[in-house]
């Protein structure tokens, strides 16, 4: 038996089945008339909608078709414009990178062919402790592999260390590290290079003149690389620094170890750039998240990026572009979260004195960046091809052309995928294939020529 009790009823009041049913509140039951009225209302609304849809004039339909066609035309025009820009700037960037890479290789090959100091083997790097002066081919191959493992391990450790410093905003330490490296290259290595060139060509020069030349060369380079100056001057100094580093590698790297290191470094570059947790990829992503440029001592840029890396302009300057410049710089200063960030902003170059239009800024931003490590290993391959006893101009030119072809393909892939790509694998692979095939198949015999 089911009982139902209302609050108004007494607890002692008995109830039977009839009184329980009478006191219970039942929901109202919809009647037939209500359902009929609701259905008529829905039919009337549907009929009005159909009349409204059928009453549209042909002009409205034509206008909608015309607007759709205009949208399609604009989309196709934008796609065509994007393709034209890709072709235009793709070809432009190929030339902008071919020139510095070729200049670096020319400096290295010219030095190797003329200065005997860089082809004499009188020592090895501390990173390649195993000697290759053994009669056994197997032992020599093993030593070259061991040297490669040590060299690649050092590169990996130093790269990870740099990424950790950058991630935790240790900008002062990185600046000091790069300044010290640039100082050694621009002063010490340049002094050695100049001395050997003067000795080779039997040019006498007193020490005060040499010191004055080295001081001017190094001081201007330090100012331009780590502070401000013309873009072309920075590019020239970066090419010279790369060439000096290449000559050191060519002199002190054993022959077999150099070839194995070139193959291994291309594989490491592929992993470091494309893997999600690769150190070079993490470095680039961190720089993009913070909207900061990577240090100029590590990167060769084919164009100046005005919107990144500029200090506060003169407040007395007028004009709309100058005011926009101040607003952008103020936002960057407010977005900095540490004292190290302000140090980065303070070392930036000043704003240009002439007003910069939006077209000029977009034109300048379309630049390609190539790591100096890529410059160095490109030229190491060509320099080693020129420095080997069996190396002639055929193998040297073949290696250089192969590197440029690989660089062109890399830039093509860069335009397709529109993300950071490793620059070493394709070029180094082509260079090694062209070098060894040319050295073994296209070698010229002097006796046959004389006959």
UniProtKB/Swiss-Prot annotation:
Residues 335-346 have a biased composition (Polar residues). A motif (PAL) lies at residues 422-424. Residues 1-93, 166-172, 224-229, 277-366, 418-421, 443-451 are cytoplasmic. SMART domains: PSN. It is found in: Endoplasmic reticulum membrane; Golgi apparatus membrane. The chain crosses the membrane at residues 94-114, 145-165, 173-193, 203-223, 230-250, 256-276, 367-387, 397-417. Keywords: Endoplasmic reticulum, Golgi apparatus, Hydrolase, Membrane, Notch signaling pathway, Protease, Transmembrane, Transmembrane helix. It is a multi-pass membrane protein. The active site is at residues 269, 374. One of its GO terms (molecular function) is aspartic endopeptidase activity, intramembrane cleaving. Signal peptide: none annotated. It is an enzyme of class 3 (hydrolase). It holds the Pfam family Presenilin. InterPro entries: Pept_A22A_PS2, Peptidase_A22A, Preselin/SPP, Presenilin_C. Residues 115-144, 194-202, 251-255, 388-396 are lumenal. Residues 422-442 dip into the membrane without crossing it. Its main location: endoplasmic reticulum. Probable catalytic subunit of the gamma-secretase complex, an endoprotease complex that catalyzes the intramembrane cleavage of integral membrane proteins such as Notch receptors and APP (amyloid-beta precursor protein). Requires the other members of the gamma-secretase complex to have a protease activity. May play a role in intracellular signaling and gene expression or in linking chromatin to the nuclear membrane. May function in the cytoplasmic partitioning of proteins. Homodimer. Component of the gamma-secretase complex, a complex composed of a presenilin homodimer (PSEN1 or PSEN2), nicastrin (NCSTN), APH1 (APH1A or APH1B) and PEN2. Such minimal complex is sufficient for secretase activity, although other components may exist. The PAL motif is required for normal active site conformation. Belongs to the peptidase A22A family. This is Presenilin-2. It comes from Gallus gallus (Chicken).
